[in-house]
From Swiss-Prot:
Record-linked PROSITE patterns: DH_1, DH_2, PDZ, PH_DOMAIN
Matches recorded under Gene3D superfamilies: 2.30.42.10, Dbl homology (DH) domain (1.20.900.10), Pleckstrin-homology domain (PH domain)/Phosphotyrosine-binding domain (PTB) (2.30.29.30), Regulator of G-protein Signalling 4, domain 2 (1.10.167.10)
Lineage of origin: Eukaryota, Metazoa, Chordata, Craniata, Vertebrata
Annotated ranges, domain PH: 1019-1132
Keywords noted in UniProt: Acetylation, Chromosomal rearrangement, Coiled coil, Cytoplasm, GTPase activation, Guanine-nucleotide releasing factor, Membrane, Phosphoprotein, Proto-oncogene
RGSL domain segment(s): 367-558
Sequence ranges assigned to domain DH in this UniProt record: 787-977
Protein's job: May play a role in the regulation of RhoA GTPase by guanine nucleotide-binding alpha-12 (GNA12) and alpha-13 (GNA13). Acts as guanine nucleotide exchange factor (GEF) for RhoA GTPase and may act as GTPase-activating protein (GAP) for GNA12 and GNA13.
Name assigned to this protein: Rho guanine nucleotide exchange factor 12
Positions of post-translational Phosphothreonine modification: T736
SMART domains (alphabetical): PDZ, PH, RhoGEF
Residue numbers marked as site, Breakpoint for translocation to form KMT2A/MLL1-ARHGEF12 oncogene: D308, S309
Amino acid sequence: MSGTQSTITDRFPLKKPIRHGSILNRESPTDKKQKVERIASHDFDPTDSSSKKTKSSSEESRSEIYGLVQRCVIIQKDDNGFGLTVSGDNPVFVQSVKEDGAAMRAGVQTGDRIIKVNGTLVTHSNHLEVVKLIKSGSYVALTVQGRPPGSPQIPLADSEVEPSVIGHMSPIMTSPHSPGASGNMERITSPVLMGEENNVVHNQKVEILRKMLQKEQERLQLLQEDYNRTPAQRLLKEIQEAKKHIPQLQEQLSKATGSAQDGAVVTPSRPLGDTLTVSEAETDPGDVLGRTDCSSGDASRPSSDNADSPKSGPKERIYLEENPEKSETIQDTDTQSLVGSPSTRIAPHIIGAEDDDFGTEHEQINGQCSCFQSIELLKSRPAHLAVFLHHVVSQFDPATLLCYLYSDLYKHTNSKETRRIFLEFHQFFLDRSAHLKVSVPDEMSADLEKRRPELIPEDLHRHYIQTMQERVHPEVQRHLEDFRQKRSMGLTLAESELTKLDAERDKDRLTLEKERTCAEQIVAKIEEVLMTAQAVEEDKSSTMQYVILMYMKHLGVKVKEPRNLEHKRGRIGFLPKIKQSMKKDKEGEEKGKRRGFPSILGPPRRPSRHDNSAIGRAMELQKARHPKHLSTPSSVSPEPQDSAKLRQSGLANEGTDAGYLPANSMSSVASGASFSQEGGKENDTGSKQVGETSAPGDTLDGTPRTLNTVFDFPPPPLDQVQEEECEVERVTEHGTPKPFRKFDSVAFGESQSEDEQFENDLETDPPNWQQLVSREVLLGLKPCEIKRQEVINELFYTERAHVRTLKVLDQVFYQRVSREGILSPSELRKIFSNLEDILQLHIGLNEQMKAVRKRNETSVIDQIGEDLLTWFSGPGEEKLKHAAATFCSNQPFALEMIKSRQKKDSRFQTFVQDAESNPLCRRLQLKDIIPTQMQRLTKYPLLLDNIAKYTEWPTEREKVKKAADHCRQILNYVNQAVKEAENKQRLEDYQRRLDTSSLKLSEYPNVEELRNLDLTKRKMIHEGPLVWKVNRDKTIDLYTLLLEDILVLLQKQDDRLVLRCHSKILASTADSKHTFSPVIKLSTVLVRQVATDNKALFVISMSDNGAQIYELVAQTVSEKTVWQDLICRMAASVKEQSTKPIPLPQSTPGEGDNDEEDPSKLKEEQHGISVTGLQSPDRDLGLESTLISSKPQSHSLSTSGKSEVRDLFVAERQFAKEQHTDGTLKEVGEDYQIAIPDSHLPVSEERWALDALRNLGLLKQLLVQQLGLTEKSVQEDWQHFPRYRTASQGPQTDSVIQNSENIKAYHSGEGHMPFRTGTGDIATCYSPRTSTESFAPRDSVGLAPQDSQASNILVMDHMIMTPEMPTMEPEGGLDDSGEHFFDAREAHSDENPSEGDGAVNKEEKDVNLRISGNYLILDGYDPVQESSTDEEVASSLTLQPMTGIPAVESTHQQQHSPQNTHSDGAISPFTPEFLVQQRWGAMEYSCFEIQSPSSCADSQSQIMEYIHKIEADLEHLKKVEESYTILCQRLAGSALTDKHSDKS
């Protein structure tokens, strides 16, 4: 190394060298001259080696001459590979570097020692592993050690390799064909070293030989490359000649270096001629050429195995002399201590980084460099894994690594222990209070919240384990990467030990034992690190220590648990089945838990308790037990200590081990003795004596004996005890064994939240119902009925168990904490909420269930449907729904407060621990008991479904199903409340983290509104990440919140949520920026899918600042679909809320009976679905306050069969229009899925504003013609109309004279069809008409006089009348009123097929006027769009265009109205008689009565006022359509511009 070189004064002392004569000097004066020149040119100082011996002098001179430096190079792979060849093992050297190759350009030199590859230390790796690392990518970073750039080449090995090896590694540059070189070769003889000066001469001669050899090798490589490109005989001869020279040089170099070895004797084996003969016989030219890459630098490959063994030199030299040609492919032949046959030593020792045949070699795995590349490899190496664990424990949070290892431990555990391992895994890593909590997927977390861990089936165990292992694997790999970097810098533990293990790694038993022994020492160091943890982290450290020790045991490492860990193991796992490390403890535990009968046969523990010594004594003990139950609380108060001890041993086992008995033993009916054997753990300690368990009321209602002591619960009523005694006597009569009764205690007296689970587990199943009834009764029942009774029995008993759990929560926690004043009243409400209400509801439900059982004396419950409906529907449903929603929605806050208070308040923590240690909690924590209410609600529909499944009577089954549906409604209501509460909690957190400091007034005019944004005042609907694609080159990662009326686009920065405005330069206006608001109001939103990306969607907002189009990209297609659906739904909901229907005057009582068009209101009242409830995902833009959307409802008649026919045709029409809509959407452009027209064609075939104006004209005609109300009805109905400002209340003098112009404008805008005007002219128009062209000013609108009504009726539209449509007559035929006008479009008459000339199929998309009670609805369009008349007015006019065109209103409204111009004698294609019969005759059955004009003048005036306002809005809507068309054209042009720029 360069650090070991001498200083200048050391290298040049004052003493001059004294040269003695030598054979070499006397024979070769020329050589002496060359030697002096060489010394001068390389700063060679012979005095440095004058006092050294032969071996040391050689090494020191090399070190002095060639100072080694370490450097890092980066090689970029080119077409010819990396351009270098490596050789050697431990370490690996650069064998050769291609001329002008990638390695040479990077600065790699022949002879460089490779230290690291991509940061991985490879000094102890073989060349196969190094090549694999180099070839792993298109570039590689090498840390190499070698001569400084520009200095002469040096041997491949450094000073740690012996001189005898150096002679075979150093390339030389002198050509053997030069005169000087040939002369040197001829004069060189075996050196005779006489004195210290001759060592210098000898070294110089060796150097010359090396350079000659290297030059010849390089020449050979060039010749072979030329031969490969252009084979020629001349090149082949030169190659053979070079191959002859190389062995000669190697032989001389071997002799020169061999004489310097201590005790080395060179014995030539045969002349060179023989050698060449052998090589030619063994290897043909093809073979020689085939090994070009492997033979380019055959003079180097040191081996650490025998580099210090001088005896290996002669053996290798003998082999070289025998096989000189094959020695080209055998690198560093003198470094192998054992010489094998030639065929076994050729291929594996040299390989180039670009060698394509590398993959076929047998790949060796070196422990040090390879096992740390992957955790999978590391798991089988105990010592290496222990070092890695030490590194992670010392530097990081080891939770993810320990989670991964414990998951692996589960996979390698036998089936008997997997449940225990999973429970520990859940407690360590998945539980909310886990000390080593890791990130758990949301779905899995929600599933775990609903299940009790010990009741989860094994297939889910494996799924959860695999999921968690995959989730933490990336983090483990990051730890491994950090470890590799630290290890390369020498910052890790036990490096020398691992190096030795890697060198001896043969995977034999001895090596594995050494690894385990080494791992024991490293584990001890890990424990030392854990011991230094703070007191607050003691539990976490103990858990970490336990996990590490368990996994090390799995690997066979002998570890001893510290004393402080042994006594904690019972608390670490859920079950007492965890094996104890000390045999005595285990035996003691078994003695206390499993040897039940010896303790039973002993003396009783207390006089008040009884043992379960034999089944025959059960009745005597039962009789002796009841007086105790009926005693006062004071009579049992002296025994709390013993009863607690007794229950501690029994309940603990029942709540845990009992759950693991086979399921078939639970349901076995034939033998109660089998129950006793299977449940031996419960029989032993006397916790479930036979006499106790034979009374279900005692245990199920809260174990009154115990609760009297602890809770002061009232004793069970006498009738209850008598009922239970009767049940016991009934069972005893028929000889059923008693032990089955103990399951009463197991499942309901001592257990808990197993009610909330529906696994076939011992604790979940109630006592077998078949044991409660006589044998004769059972024989008279069908198997289906027996199943039904069992499910009913389970419903009753699990309800008892739930009541007991709620009482535990109330008495053990709530009452005590309130008495002791540990929490304030507000904190009590936050944690326990309305616990009293919940408890009373379930107590009442339990009492009603008991009453049902009492009235069925044979325990066979026949009818239960009515009772279930009473409990779960009507008032009972409402009470339970609201109470449970209040309690359960508070659950997230309660659990969070418990967690935070336990950390901050030591008094509260002590209380909780003390309460949870109460045996009545059955080892459940407070955080486990609170969710039991939610879990109970999930059980009801399942049980009721099972009851219905086994019910044979149809009426009864329907009642039970209906009750089950009500239970689901309760559950859904509560789930929604819980979700909203959780969302509210998250919104509060988001509001706390919201950062509005980036908002600037210059960027966005409404910045103050954004700064004052309060998320907590809204409800959150959805949230998640989205990517905002601003343009082709700019994307922004967003965290998006969908609230009830806005969409908020946030950016995550650290822990903040930043609200920031972004700008974009539009292609059409390159000189200005368009600023996008991060808050989008849903009342202005239209959503469309992006045609070119199925994960993206357009959110188009029409704000006060203009149109804003956001392209948002989701992570998956399903997520995009969810976002699109929710945004559409919420936008529709916001628009619906902002619009109210206009009430119309009610009909007289006599005419109300004949009204056929009342379904909208009827449906609203009956089904709770608003007229605009069904929303289409394709919404039109509108302002934030006005526009709503609604699909037309298929209104049905309440009493007539005509409704079915009409609904059928309405459904067909809707389907056809939806198909047309889908087809329209499919024809959108490539960049925008909006109907963007071509610039040279009309924008749209349908003009919704014109349609609306046309329909408004028809509405006006209808009202003017038919509406007449009495003064009384006007006064009654006036309350339905809100008060509005009127533009003009004066008499209207102008008649409606321009309806034909309205029709003309409509036709020219929508159909582009020629039509006949009043004068008979044919007019065709392709451009949209402006309002001034089509309509008169507003003040010209007035009521038509009576004598002009006939002409008003003549104003009809080709689009309304469809000649091709058949006549759909209602029952009773079509009367003169022509009521089809109010039916679906398909109901129009076909009596006049010749009328309406110029009509087309497209005209079938008519607008139907429906008068439904107090509401007027215009329908007939598919996607829905509403427009409000004013911010104060909510319109009931529902306009439904085919595709979404934004409807925007502004303060500047130009108001027009359609009018009629038939006064000029124009000929109409429709006669008044036909119109009256077909269109307006329906008024006989409507809610209106034709009155004289004088009687309804006020009403007509008010209606006309509303119509004027509608007209104004629709006129503006038409203008907006035109503006929107221009905007779409601009966007289309921008998209085309972007496309062309992309292509260019």
